[in-house]
């Protein structure tokens, strides 16, 4: 089931992972807060992005951006819960500005899976670019 969805997503079906929470939500380890963050992150569509603060607002903790980042760092299923689509507000604004000016979006992406630099953040950047090219809008937008 999960493998089939990943294959469909890789083949270009941007909606293949939309309801992945049905596969995992009750089985995932984590606190209720972490699970609410992961559920909100799953609502961010391919080719779109949200900020940590956006996710915090959606789950009812408007000043909880840092806690959202910490919860995403503990995400146990990286592609099925697309935490790579969640960026610091400054990186989201920089990506929007770069797109308007014809530059490269996603030069700054924040952390990924606990790393702030290096191969994991490079992977996050490449996933964002790949999804924007594959599934449409490179314009960062919430949900």
Language model: regions and residue ranges:
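Basic nucleic-acid-binding alpha-helical/helix-turn surface characteristic of O6-alkylguanine DNA
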Residues: 1-63, 106, 122-143
């Amino acid at each position: 089931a999960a493998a089939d969805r990943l294959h469909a997503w890789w083949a270009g079906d941007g909606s293949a992972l939309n309801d992945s929470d049905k596969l995992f939500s009750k089985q995932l380890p984590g606190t209720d807060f972490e699970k609410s963050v992961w559920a909100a992150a799953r609502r961010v569509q391919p080719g779109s992005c949200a900020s940590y603060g956006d996710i915090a607002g959606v789950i009812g903790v408007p000043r909880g951006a840092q806690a959202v980042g910490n919860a995403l760092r503990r995400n146990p299923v990286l592609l099925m819960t697309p935490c790579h689509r969640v960026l610091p507000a400054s990186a989201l604004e920089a990506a929007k500005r770069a797109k308007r000016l014809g530059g490269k979006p996603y030069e700054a992406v924040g952390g990924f899976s606990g790393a702030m630099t290096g191969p994991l953040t490079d992977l996050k950047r490449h996933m964002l670019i790949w999804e924007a090219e594959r599934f449409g809008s490179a314009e960062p937008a919430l949900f």
